């Protein structure tokens, strides 16, 4: 099965190739000149929903539903997601992602290029296979070092997961996780717990939660 190549042009010759999920500057969209990088999972979802609504603004509730489908997220979390995405896109003047008062957010797209041919998966090397992703529904899981801080919940902000040999960042602002719920999930083995770190195994991945740095790092075995 292949993928249709869709490339979005933003102001200042900034491009987002949805197929490879790469953001870069270029005169020719097929010849990246300066790579910005790969958007995080939350940033990718945000770009997709804003592009789907373009040229209309996307309502805040629709953005929240697209970014965090499994749980309630405050408006502050949405604001932080917008800010981080603007920072990633070098949108310091807030002209690429605009805040439309009482309507939501709108993305400034110059043009959209859609390939007429379906490309092979090899051409979309950054496409992440669902089967290769860590199978955790983060909106339904709680992680807390209850043996040490029984009443303290730890908010995990950036989460890194492993897929096709690449690191991807996933921001989970505002979500807390309960270790007891995590341990009940099928396929998860809690291996080590301390004041600073939790280690567990899931779906052929070795994962480590660092409470101080608020990160989760997973590598494929």
From Swiss-Prot:
Q: Report the gene name.
A: tcpP
User: Which Gene3D superfamilies has this protein been placed in?
Assistant: Winged helix-like DNA-binding domain superfamily/Winged helix DNA-binding domain
What happens when you mutate residue 20 to S? In strain: Z17561
Q: Which GO terms describe its biological process?
A: phosphorelay signal transduction system; positive regulation of DNA-templated transcription
User: What is the protein's name according to its record?
Assistant: Toxin coregulated pilus biosynthesis protein P
Membrane topology, as annotated: Single-pass membrane protein
Question: InterPro entries in the record, alphabetically?
Answer: OmpR/PhoB-type_DNA-bd, Sig_transdc_resp-reg_C-effctor, WH-like_DNA-bd_sf
Which spans are transmembrane here? Answer: 143-163
């Amino acid at each position: 099965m292949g993928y249709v190549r869709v490339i979005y042009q933003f102001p200042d010759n900034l491009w987002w190739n949805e197929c490879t999920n790469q953001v870069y500057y270029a005169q020719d969209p097929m010849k990246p000149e300066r790579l910005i990088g790969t958007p995080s999972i939350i940033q990718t979802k945000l770009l997709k929903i804003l592009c789907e609504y373009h040229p209309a603004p996307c309502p805040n509730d629709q953005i929240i539903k697209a970014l965090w489908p499994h749980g309630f997220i405050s408006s502050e979390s949405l604001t932080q997601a917008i800010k981080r995405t603007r920072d990633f896109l070098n949108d310091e003047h807030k002209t690429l992602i605009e805040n439309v008062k009482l309507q939501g957010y709108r993305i400034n797209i110059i043009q959209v290029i859609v390939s007429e041919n379906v490309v092979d998966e090899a051409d979309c090397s950054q496409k992440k296979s669902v089967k290769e992703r860590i199978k955790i529904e983060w909106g339904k899981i709680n992680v807390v070092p209850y043996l040490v801080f029984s009443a303290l919940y730890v908010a995990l902000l950036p989460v890194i997961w492993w897929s096709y040999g690449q690191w991807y960042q996933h921001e989970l602002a505002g979500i807390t996780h309960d270790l007891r719920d995590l341990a009940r999930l099928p396929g998860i083995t809690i291996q080590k717990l301390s004041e600073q770190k939790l280690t567990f195994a899931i779906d052929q991945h070795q994962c480590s939660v660092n409470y101080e740095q608020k990160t989760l790092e997973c590598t494929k075995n």
